[in-house]
C-alpha cells in the first residue's frame, strides 16, 4: 500500500487529501468492497473469451464481425454485463460499443475508453491463458491487466457514482473497442462515422497522467535474396508489439550439420550463454529453437530477444554457407539492441526520452528472411527522416524496407487544467511528487480528439506485493503481454476507488477548457 493508500482500511490515513475528498473516498471504498466479488467474476467472464483481433473480409464480416469471432463474442458479453447493471448499450457494428445513457449529449460527456481485444498468448503459461484463476491475491489470465480488468472496472465506476448519488454535471460514457492491439482500425472506423465525447480518458496506462505518446512506425526488413539450402525456414514471435520469447529455424538434415550445431551449443553453454535446443524432427529436418524473455516492445528493458539469440547461433554455423550466415549476422545486429543505433535512427528528446526499435516477428516470405520492426519514436523526431534512414540502412545491407504504418505522436498540453488537476490529486493521495509523463506505449488517445491516457496501472507496490510477485512469477512473466499475465487485486481495487474519486473531481471543471493539444 502506498503512503496514502486505503484499500481494505476503514478510516484510513488520507491526510494528503482535502476533508471532502477523504469523506467521499471512504464512501467509494465501502461501495467497491461490497461489490468486490461481483467485479472479479465479471472480469473472469471477459477473460474466458479468446478475443485476439483477426480482421475479416467480405461475407465473413456479417457472421464474425470485423475482427473475428472472439472479438465479436467479447463485445456481446461486455454489453450484456453493462445491461445487467442498468446501462443502455449500443453496438457500433462490432467496432466500438458504447455504455451509458440512452440519450447522449457528447458535447457534455466525459468518455472512458478501453479495449476488449488481447495480444496472442505466446508460450510459457503455467495454466491455460483463458481459464482465469486467483493465486495469492493475483487474478491470472490473458487480458486481466490489458485491458479487460480496467474495462469492467469502468462499468462499476459509473454504477458507483450513480448509486452513491454523486451529483455530476457531465454525462459519463464508456467506449469499448476490439482492435487496439493490432492496429486501431476500430477507432479509425468509429470516429469516421460517430461522435466522440468532449474529453476522453483512456484507462490503459499508468498514474498520474500520460499526456503524450511517442509515434509508432511498423514495417518489415526483407532480404533481397532467398535463403539458401540447407535453411528451409525461420520464424518467431506472435505479435508486432511483443519482444519474442521463442524463435525457430528448420534446416535440411545432415549428420555433419547436426554435429556442428551440437558442438556450437556446447561451446555456447560453456561460455555462459543460454542453451539453444537442437532437435532432429525426422531424417529430413533439424529444428533449432532459441528462447528469450518477453516484454512489451515499447518497454523493452529487461527482455531477451529470442530472434537475436537464434540469429547469433545460426550466424556461427559454417555448415549453413556464407550467404546464409551473412544474412543471420545482419539479423543479429538488427535484433541486438532496442534504441535504433544499428539502423541509424537513434534519437532522444527531453519530452519523451529515447526512440526504441525492436525486432518482434521473424518469418520466411517466399523463401526470403523477413523481420518486423516495431519503432516508438520520440515526439520531436522527424519521422520522414527516420524512414529515409531505414531505407538507406536496408539498401546498404541487402534488404528492402517495407513500411506498414506511421502513427504520429499524440501530445496533450501538460499545463492543461485536467492534467494538472489529476496529477495534483494523485500526489495528494499518495503523498508523492510525481509528474505527468510521456510513454512509448500506444493507446486510443492517439486516435481521438481531446484525449489522454490515465490509469489504472503504475500503483506503488509494497513489500508484500513484491514478495508475492517473486513467489508467483518467473522472470518474463506476470506482466501485460507476458505469460501468466496477472492482476494484483489489492492494487486494482485501490486504483479503481481512486479513479472514481478523480472522475468526481474532474466533473467540477468546465468542459469548455478541454482543448486538444497538437503534436509538437
Each model region followed by its residue ranges:
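Acidic/His- and Gly-rich active-site-bordering loop/insert found
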Residues: 11-140, 164-168, 463
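Predominant activation on well-ordered alpha-helical scaffold segments within soluble catalytic domains
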Residues: 44, 79, 152-159, 188, ...
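A generic structural motif
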Residues: 97-99, 249, 284-291, 370-373, ...
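Active-site metal-coordination/substrate-binding segment of hydrolases
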Residues: 107-176, 182, 194, 471-494
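Acidic/histidine-rich catalytic neighborhood of metal-dependent amide-processing enzymes
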Residues: 147-226, 262, 339-350, 514-520
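Acidic-enriched catalytic cores of C-N bond-cleaving enzymes acting on peptides and small amides
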Residues: 211-222, 226-235, 240-293, 297-360, ...
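An extended, acidic, His-containing surface patch that forms the Zn2+-binding/catalytic region
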Residues: 294, 298-366, 379-385, 400-520
